Amino acid sequence: MDLRIGQGYDVHALVPGRPLIIGGVTIPYERGLLGHSDADVLLHAITDALFGAAALGDIGRHFPDTATEFKGANSRVLLRECAARIARAGFTIQNVDSTVIAQAPKLAPHIDGMRANIAEDLNLPIDRVNVKAKTNEKLGYLGRGEGIEAQAAALLVRV
């Protein structure tokens, strides 16, 4: 059995005037994440983990931030396209585990919606998708509320 594990990471700065979208969920907050696309830090980390597990590079290789067609892109669309490319490469996604690190806002009320979106986009049962939320205990740039980080791991199997 050919199992593949991938790890993904992303971070974006929090700025005024942008919506805060994490895991495809718009979260009420006075600031949002800065980025070329919708800056969904969680979906970007998951996308990187999936591409990495299949040895297909990273999100920037497939959806470069220099390409105008990805300006303001919905990261759920990118995640679905990633899943299609993974399938074309001969893999099925087994599960995804992820962590979002944010001092604020509280993410717990939004976790179920994030999991549902990710499961839908990856065509997985929801019990194969996990999202955790942590603070940075007020340490560093994350603890000062300057940004939000996400980490993800994905398991693929070659079919």
Swiss-Prot record:
Name of this chain's protein: 2-C-methyl-D-erythritol 2,4-cyclodiphosphate synthase
Documented EC number(s): 4.6.1.12
A GO biological-process term: terpenoid biosynthetic process
The protein's enzyme class: lyase
Pathway annotation: Isoprenoid biosynthesis; isopentenyl diphosphate biosynthesis via DXP pathway; isopentenyl diphosphate from 1-deoxy-D-xylulose 5-phosphate: step 4/6
HAMAP family, A to Z: IspF
Any one Gene Ontology molecular-function term assigned to this protein's record: metal ion binding
Annotated residues for binding of a divalent metal cation: 10, 12, 44
Gene3D superfamilies associated with the record: 2-C-methyl-D-erythritol 2,4-cyclodiphosphate synthase (3.30.1330.50)
Keywords: Isoprene biosynthesis, Lyase, Metal-binding
Binding site for 4-CDP-2-C-methyl-D-erythritol 2-phosphate: 10-12, 36-37, 58-60, 144
Family: Belongs to the IspF family.
Binding partners and assembly: Homotrimer.
Record function comment: Involved in the biosynthesis of isopentenyl diphosphate (IPP) and dimethylallyl diphosphate (DMAPP), two major building blocks of isoprenoid compounds. Catalyzes the conversion of 4-diphosphocytidyl-2-C-methyl-D-erythritol 2-phosphate (CDP-ME2P) to 2-C-methyl-D-erythritol 2,4-cyclodiphosphate (ME-CPP) with a corresponding release of cytidine 5-monophosphate (CMP).
Catalytic activity of the protein: 4-CDP-2-C-methyl-D-erythritol 2-phosphate = 2-C-methyl-D-erythritol 2,4-cyclic diphosphate + CMP
Cofactors that this protein relies on: a divalent metal cation
Keyword Transcription regulation: no
Cofactor notes: Binds 1 divalent metal cation per subunit.
